Amino acid sequence: MAASVVKTPKCPRRGSVKDVAQNAPRTAPTSSKEANWNWWLLLATVFLVTFATRFYKVTEPDHICWDETHFGKMGSWYINRTFFFDVHPPLGKMLIGLSGYLTGYNGTFPFEKPGDKYNETRYQGMRYFCTTLGALIMPMGFDTVYDLTRSHEAALLAAAYLIFDVGLLTLNQYILLDPILLFFMMASVWGMVKVSKSTASGGSYGLRWWLWLFLTGTMLSCTISVKFVGLFVVLLVGLHTATELWLILGDLGQPILETVKQLACRAITLIVWPVLLYILFFYIHLSVLNRSGNGDGFYSSAFQSRLIGNSLYNASMPRDVAYGSLVTIKNHKTGGGYLHSHHHLYPKGSGARQQQVTTYTHKDENNKWLIRPHNKPGPPKGKVQILRHGDLVRLTHMATRRNLHSHNEPAPMTKKHLQVTGYGELGLGDANDVWRVLIVGGKVNETVHTVTSRLKFIHLLQNCALTSSGKQLPKWGFEQQEVSCNPNVRDKNSQWNVEDNEHKLMPSVSFSVYAPGFFARFLESHAVMLQGNAGLKPKEGEVTSRPWQWPINYRGQFFSGSSYRIYLLGNPLIWWSNLVFLALFVTVFLCNAVVQQRRAGFARSAAQNQAQVPDSETVAQDEESEHSTTDICSCCTPAKEIVPKAVPSGSPEAPNPAQSLRAAAWLFLGWMLHYLPFWAMGRVLYFHHYFPALIFNSLLTGVMYNYILRVLPKWIHHVILGLVLSILVYSFAAFSPLAYGMSGPLANEPNSTMYNLKWLSTWEF
């Protein structure tokens, strides 16, 4: 395609954005129409190939695969309006439940474990929904790269890298949060680029500009409402927006009021609007899930009082706690469990071989304790004796009839604390069973109240506080939480409250007055989610991974381990070539930065040695030095530029190499933001956590491919692209059984059809 040299309009730092739009080079209408047809043809091809590959065998296997057991179950709970606890925000699970409901699923399938057959269950609608969102990532990726490069070849290659990755295909075909998350993340980046493009072409404050701004804000809110890792794309869009505002501020052709207007518009659409949407999603979540479920115990007693069917809902219990009360005692920290015991003993090497005492987050008969005087078998018969601040008590576990006990033995997990056990027979024990009850901030003789009083239990002899350390016990403790006696009696983890209170002789009162409002529950939900997320631990036999393994495709992850096997693994040719283009970008970017810095230094040196009027060569060098790699303005161009004539009408001219490099820099930043933070995370990590970063890497590959091959004639460019696409298609066909299903011998057996594809010993398919 012929090219011509055109003079570029002034940078908006010397003239207005409108000047740039008015002075933009005019292109031939015929060529523009041809480019538009090419764009639509390629986009249609991307759509067809994407949907063909994604929906092929989407309902197979017809059994639960991997985390479908969690998110399918949660979709069922939304349909049944049953409250549950999860570490992720609610939007993705609400959409899964909604898609199931609209396609005829009734919410009764148990989703117990991977491998269970769906049988007559109408699960297909939920898979179709997740797959559809996953399939829309590729067209958006195509258009995003096209807007960044104005290159059909770059856009097509980036889309091909997304389409023909069998790992992304596998992740898109099941009832999971990941395709929903990736869709909203990609839509956020797409909107960000569209806003930048519209602003650069002088379209600010037009209808299209506003629509793209609101779309971007909506997608940002949806991304972080699916998983908290959506914060990374929020940060990316925020940095990009701040950069654009900074460049608008430096546009001397515009009054400073223009910057204020732009800032206000973006604050409304990219901050206020997403926050309101985020709150709305939680309002819907808490309104729909209004029935008691197995996740109640993760939340405070007051929170539970809003759940229909919970023992605290419209509860009528004694207001005061008395001797002889049968109570449950809940740790007052966020996500705290119930004081719990059972017949099992601590194992050898974990302190005295006495009965285990733990905290447990689920309601259970083993959570009930009887409050007794410290020096009598019980209160006087027929009389009520109120429990007060400073009283000495024994707590007897009702199911086992052993007393809450501590002694001078180290706790099993927190060695600086003392062990807490169940001790004695039928309520008879020793002096180590005596605890002093203190109300936090209480006064002498102040009454202990149900739910509202925050309590400390101080051991009389050891002077330590009953504490939930938050540490998880091993298998011998059923992975419940350790309870210990902490010498630091001021530790906030040593605060408790009485949740359930039964006493035959005391009048009951309604507790509905203590039910919290929406914002109190909204804040508590976040505290519980964040704490749960940070404390995630791998289950026994579960395959986890570390961040260094992800970019090199070191090990995959089984989605289905039955005779019909599904294995999550990236297309190695795509993943490893992505790393090559990452390295190329870093190399080119650094070299370009060095060259620009040297040119700037040369220009300054030459200017000092010139006469008062510099010659034209020095001026040209000075102008060229302005276009450094740190200038990210989407509408700045060098003094001279080669521009293809065939550009779609109404769109900005093709970016020059420096602009392409700056576009690649933003994609590289997106990759870093979605990858590097995982190195600092202490929680359990899995291979699928890398896929948001993979999308940025694949888009970067398309941009860098165009940057590197831009100097070649078009026909050579097309030949190379054809060869690359052929290799991608072939590799996809070879590795597609990983996504579509494998049967027969494993790949490490010579008679396996996958034998020659096991390139790394760590691949387990």
From Swiss-Prot:
Principal subcellular localisation of the protein: endoplasmic reticulum
- On whether Glycoprotein is a keyword of this UniProt record, the answer is yes
TM stretches of this protein: 35-55, 128-148, 175-195, 206-226, 228-248, 268-288, 566-586, 667-687, 689-709, 719-739
Q: GO cellular component annotations, sorted alphabetically?
A: dolichyl-phosphate-mannose-protein mannosyltransferase complex; endoplasmic reticulum; endoplasmic reticulum membrane
Glycan attachment residues as annotated in the record: 80, 106, 119, 290, 314, 445, 751
The UniProt keyword set, sorted, is:
Developmental protein, Endoplasmic reticulum, Glycoprotein, Glycosyltransferase, Membrane, Repeat, Transferase, Transmembrane, Transmembrane helix
* GO MF annotation terms: dolichyl-phosphate-mannose-protein mannosyltransferase activity
Cite the InterPro entries for this sequence: GlyclTrfase_39-like, Glyco_trans_39/83, MIR_dom_sf, MIR_motif, PMT_4TMC
Q: Which PROSITE patterns match?
A: MIR
> How is expression of this protein distributed across tissues?
At the cellular blastoderm stage, expression accumulates in the ventrally located mesoderm primordium. At germ band extension, mesoderm expression is seen as stripes of strong expression. A very strong signal is also detected in the invaginating gut. As the germ band retracts, mesodermal expression decays and becomes restricted to somatic muscle precursors.
Q: Which SUPFAM superfamilies match?
A: MIR domain (SSF82109)
Localization, UniProt = Endoplasmic reticulum membrane
Protein name, please?
Protein O-mannosyl-transferase 2
